[in-house]
Curated annotation (Swiss-Prot):
<feature type="binding site">
    <location>
        <position position="63"/>
    </location>
    <ligand>
        <name>Zn(2+) 1</name>
    </ligand>
</feature>
<keyword id="KW-0378">Hydrolase</keyword>
<dbReference type="GO" id="GO:0004038">
    <property type="term" value="F:allantoinase activity"/>
</dbReference>
<dbReference type="InterPro" id="IPR032466">
    <property type="entry name" value="Metal_Hydrolase"/>
</dbReference>
<dbReference type="InterPro" id="IPR050138">
    <property type="entry name" value="DHOase/Allantoinase_Hydrolase"/>
</dbReference>
<feature type="binding site">
    <location>
        <position position="180"/>
    </location>
    <ligand>
        <name>Zn(2+) 2</name>
    </ligand>
</feature>
<feature type="binding site">
    <location>
        <position position="146"/>
    </location>
    <ligand>
        <name>Zn(2+) 2</name>
    </ligand>
</feature>
<feature type="binding site">
    <location>
        <position position="146"/>
    </location>
    <ligand>
        <name>Zn(2+) 1</name>
    </ligand>
</feature>
<dbReference type="InterPro" id="IPR011059">
    <property type="entry name" value="Metal-dep_hydrolase_composite"/>
</dbReference>
<dbReference type="InterPro" id="IPR004722">
    <property type="entry name" value="DHOase"/>
</dbReference>
<keyword id="KW-0665">Pyrimidine biosynthesis</keyword>
<feature type="binding site">
    <location>
        <position position="229"/>
    </location>
    <ligand>
        <name>Zn(2+) 2</name>
    </ligand>
</feature>
<protein>
    <recommendedName>
        <fullName>Dihydroorotase</fullName>
        <ecNumber>3.5.2.3</ecNumber>
    </recommendedName>
</protein>
<keyword id="KW-0479">Metal-binding</keyword>
<comment type="function">
    <text>Catalyzes the reversible cyclization of carbamoyl aspartate to dihydroorotate.</text>
</comment>
<dbReference type="GO" id="GO:0004151">
    <property type="term" value="F:dihydroorotase activity"/>
</dbReference>
<feature type="binding site">
    <location>
        <position position="301"/>
    </location>
    <ligand>
        <name>substrate</name>
    </ligand>
</feature>
Amino acid sequence: MLALRVLLKGKILIGGRVREREVLAEDGWIVKIGKRLNEEADLTLELGKRELAVPAPIDLHVHCRDPHPDYPFGFKTETRRFLLGGVATVVDMPNTRPAPTTPETYYEKEELARENAEIEVIVAGGVRDSQCTKELVEAGAYVLGEVFLATSTDAPAVPWSTLPEIFRELSPDGPLTIFHPELDELVAERPARNLYEHLKNRPPEAETTAVGLLAGLKVRYPSRIHLSHVTLPESVKIAKGADITVDVTPHHLFFDVLRVDPEDPVFKVNPPLRGRHHRLGLLRAVRRGDVDVLASDHAPHILEDEFEDVPSGVTGGEIILPAALTLHRRFGLSLRDAVAMITCRPAKLLGRDDLGEVAVGKRARITVVRMREFVVRAEEFGEEDRKFPYDGMRMFGEPVKLIDGTKVYDLKESRREGKPVILEGE
């Protein structure tokens, strides 16, 4: 049953500050906010003492693998997992088969997402060359990329020599274009038997050189480009100097090659986990406010035994909200900035002024979290047999409810049942 009028009462993060308020949503939009509204509703949620309502997260970088003939995953399976973690909006990357590199394949993928996704999926158009970039811009794609500058899983590299022509099709008021900043010429294609060998194959200079070259192109061709999953504080510094936005992943902030078993294939990912000093430098950049967004780079793979045989990529879109709140609780990031990294900042980059805040006139997408530590369990998200590095990890801020328009989900019950459980209105 749809709850056309939802009334939320309790502690709510509004404008970056925690306030005792009531929020009324009607037909999927926030229509009133006040200390006491005296309004009737189809469903009223009164928050508990340790519960806090925040804008529902936006994950700027996921791979749902749909369409793709070789994966048993897709929009249905992956967006259900995101929903179980309280996420309401994701941007899906284009390394699929077929890739959305023409208006036709782009529209087909959008339709596939509309038919199967449990939450909103923003489809990113695939960049192959300047012609397809031009066609996708004309077709209305407002996100392009991830543009791979080095070969990765299911993603051939876009030759560096073609980038100036691609940049000519971009503009300061054009689509957000997301880049994977590793340079193919500096990446080795040798087999790797452990994380150390994988790291050696994809060294830091492959990233910093790519970032520097992209910064030069940005100066020459003004555009809205964004660097995803950067792993080095030097990369952040170069990007900031060129007014380029960046995101980092939870796995690059929480793990390094010294904190995990180097032969564990779960942690094989591109770009690779770095050393401890790189990870701590990246955390310092986050605390300084130099990193714009926290994004998961959710990339599902079935877990295999042999390190060499395992594709690169990990899942984690389900825990993007607890990851942000853990940065607040344990690493000194303010609550305002921690939540902004997964809400209003990605919304601004996407040009979506209907998302990212609890405010009148915004979409009613709000997640309720219990502000306490909890243990992440892979089985609660259907991640038992996949590359999920967060199993057993203690995090802060357990998602317990999700308001997504006219639907209100009980997330704890949903995780228990393994499917969305909608709260009934009166």
